[in-house]
Amino acid sequence: MQRANIILLSLILMGYLAESALLATAGCILLVMRLSKLNRLMFLLERRGLEVGLIFLMLSVLVPLAHDNIVYKELVMKTLSPQGLLALIGGTLATHMNGEGLKLLKLDPQLIFGMVIGSLIGIVFLGGIPIGPLMAAGLTALFLEVIYWFK
């Protein structure tokens, strides 16, 4: 059995044991694609998969704004409240960190495996929720930058 198949099977097993349906499903899909020799589709996923995933994530977050039952005055009031302003700051910093994480992943895609293992540790031992590699990559980029400052 080839190494890639073993790694994918390991990811499926880790996803199952950590009760992470996302990881297990992604591993299954990649294994089926690999065994079916769908190389073109794998190449497309490698090049554009993150962008497509981000589009779907953005759509899911923006759906409430597309409904007509939102009271816009209330939305503005919530946004300008202390919690809303902190949410604006948090969103701004998080998207900046995610951008730095994306740069890091493009420069060194092998880091994703450590991030997956770290996510599994967070799920199993800290009760975390896996939201994807970008935040983990953003934090990794921040940690690497801090280490660079102290060298």
From Swiss-Prot:
Q: Where are the membrane-spanning stretches? A: 6-26, 52-72, 75-95, 111-131
Q: Which GO terms describe its cellular component?
A: plasma membrane
Give its localization.
Answer: Cell membrane
Q: How is this protein situated with respect to the membrane?
A: Multi-pass membrane protein
InterPro entries named in the record: UPF0756_TM
Main location, first listed in the record: membrane
Keywords (A to Z) from UniProt: Cell membrane, Membrane, Transmembrane, Transmembrane helix
Instruction: Please name one Pfam family that this protein belongs to.
Output: DUF441
* Family as reported in the entry's similarity comment: Belongs to the UPF0756 family.
| Protein name (record) | UPF0756 membrane protein Dred_1097
Native species: Desulforamulus reducens (strain ATCC BAA-1160 / DSM 100696 / MI-1)
